[in-house]
């Protein structure tokens, strides 16, 4: 049975279709755009993890020679990431407690520009070594999928642990077991 829609019914139907599309499309579109094509799976435990020099946001430079024969924690984060905001204070505690025992750390900000990362580090009084993962550094330290990402490079230069997502405080503290 064909029914001719009155103008009010047609307008209402278009409005409902637009509203339904608005509810479904933005999350899908945001999810499709949020995942950069250059993200990789986590490094495999046991594989060699080569390092490259990196300019630090607070000045100075990360030199891979600093990490030879030592444990290095690589930490991919962003100033806008709520999970990173929960984990970063724990990373600072780990840095404060273990750097005297030889722990090395390199936090890699994936912010679009270095300015938000610098402002965030200053605001939170974080002192762990941090670099901005710009296009050049991205080639040496490609960001694994997910955020935050924590990778431990053992004294032998191989991946000892690789974690995607927020770590609980006790999990961050346990990273010291690799020392």
Task: Kindly label every feature range from the protein language model.
Residues 71-72, 148:
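Alpha/beta-hydrolase fold active-site loops
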Residues 52-71:
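A short beta-strand-turn-helix
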Residues 124-126, 134-175:
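Thiol/disulfide oxidoreductase modules built on the thioredoxin-like
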Residues 28-51, 119:
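N-proximal helix/coil linker or "cap" segments that precede and/or mark the start of modular domains
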Residues 1-14, 18-27:
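N-terminal secretory signal peptides
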Residues 103-114, 128-134:
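Thiol-based oxidoreductase modules, predominantly thioredoxin-like and allied folds used
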């Amino acid at each position: 049975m064909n029914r001719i829609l009155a103008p009010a019914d047609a307008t209402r139907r278009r409005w409902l279709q637009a509203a339904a599309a608005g509810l479904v499309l933005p999350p899908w579109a945001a999810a499709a755009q949020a995942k950069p094509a250059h993200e990789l799976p986590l490094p495999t435990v046991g594989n060699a993890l080569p390092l490259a020099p990196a300019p630090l946001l607070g000045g100075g430079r990360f030199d891979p020679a600093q990490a030879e024969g030592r444990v290095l924690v690589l930490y991919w984060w962003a100033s806008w990431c709520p999970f990173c905001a929960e984990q970063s204070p724990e990373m600072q505690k780990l840095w404060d407690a273990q750097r005297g025992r030889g722990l090395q750390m390199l936090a890699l900000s994936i912010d679009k520009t270095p300015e938000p990362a610098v402002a965030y580090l200053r605001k939170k009084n974080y002192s762990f070594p941090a670099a901005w993962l710009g296009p050049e550094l991205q080639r040496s330290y490609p960001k694994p999928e997910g955020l935050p990402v924590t990778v431990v490079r053992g004294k032998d230069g191989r991946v000892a642990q690789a974690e995607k997502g927020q770590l609980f405080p006790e999990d961050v503290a346990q990273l010291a077991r690799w020392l």
